[in-house]
Amino acid sequence: MWRMSHSLPSGMSRYAFSPQDTDFTSSYPGPSAMNHRGGRGGGYNDFSGGGSAMGSMCNMAPAISTNSVNSGGGDCGDNQGCNGTNLIVNYLPQDMTDRELYALFRTCGPINTCRIMKDYKTGYSFGYAFVDFASEIDAQNAIKSLNGVTVRNKRLKVSYARPGGESIKDTNLYVTNLPRTITDDELEKIFGKYGNIVQKNILRDKLTGKPRGVAFVRFNKREEAQEAISALNNVIPEGASQPLTVRLAEEHGKMKAHHFMNQLGMGPPAAPIPAAGPGYNSMVHRGRHNKNRNQKPHPYHNPQKFI
């Protein structure tokens, strides 16, 4: 029922949900559970129910021409490297399950995989997911129909998932010294003015659930992340008492690894043994192995002993 995908970020669990052997319709209320207010295109759509109730939104959208590409304000836009079937869904409710996500998108068309990103140790949802459709037209229809839909007071953002590699390098920021009362909306207000935030995650105390003053903020573009660093690093934001530290998450990871190695007393790697040349003392560089030179070989290492 579950398949593990590859190429995961550190500490993150990505499960591919395979719906083929599961009957979802029996677990969800019918259309009466759907609370639909207004239409698409700026309207307000609230799906407080699950399953078929949420998923029926896609049936309200007209078919999309194969010549049109509606990114829905997504991350790729005209980037031809984007996968035409793989979507990223941001701002999911914290308690949303893979079954509910599948039911929401399934009526837009057949789905290959459907997965909510979670911490592999705690199961904590990072609030975003990937949905891979069988066809590009169904993926386009899902963006047009479900982008902006409100589910349990969360307004979903549905767009094309960006490819990995260089296109997303240096877009993830590590932020410290945030107020211990910071909320997602306040974090969005501080960083949102510098670009399109793809993902944000406030780290919380495992026991109390309160913010630890640390967060990760991922932007859509490298330039947006650099602008946020230039504008906010060593700056005291409104409501805070100390200046923020804002740097690339990759740099933070390298610094943390270096500090850990030093604590273990490992330090930097030792210098290589020099090659023979002027001033080379062979007796010094042969080391302790030189004392075993005259020992007789073990019988197992001398086949002639057994002949």
Swiss-Prot record:
PROSITE patterns in alphabetical order: RRM
SMART domains registered for this protein in UniProt: RRM (SM00360)
RRM domain residues: 85-163, 171-251
Compartment(s): Nucleus
Keywords for the protein's UniProt record, in alphabetical order: Nucleus, Repeat, RNA-binding
A single BP term in Gene Ontology: sex determination
Residue ranges of the TM segments: none
Chain positions covered by the region annotation Disordered: 285-307
Biased composition (Basic residues): 285-299
A Pfam family recorded for this sequence: RRM_1
SUPFAM superfamilies in the record: RNA-binding domain, RBD
Single GO term (MF): mRNA binding
Annotated Gene Ontology cellular component terms: nucleus; ribonucleoprotein complex
NCBIfam families according to UniProt: sex-lethal
Chain's role: Unknown; apparently not involved in somatic sex determination.
Protein name: Sex-lethal homolog
Organism: Chrysomya rufifacies
Gene that specifies this protein: SXL
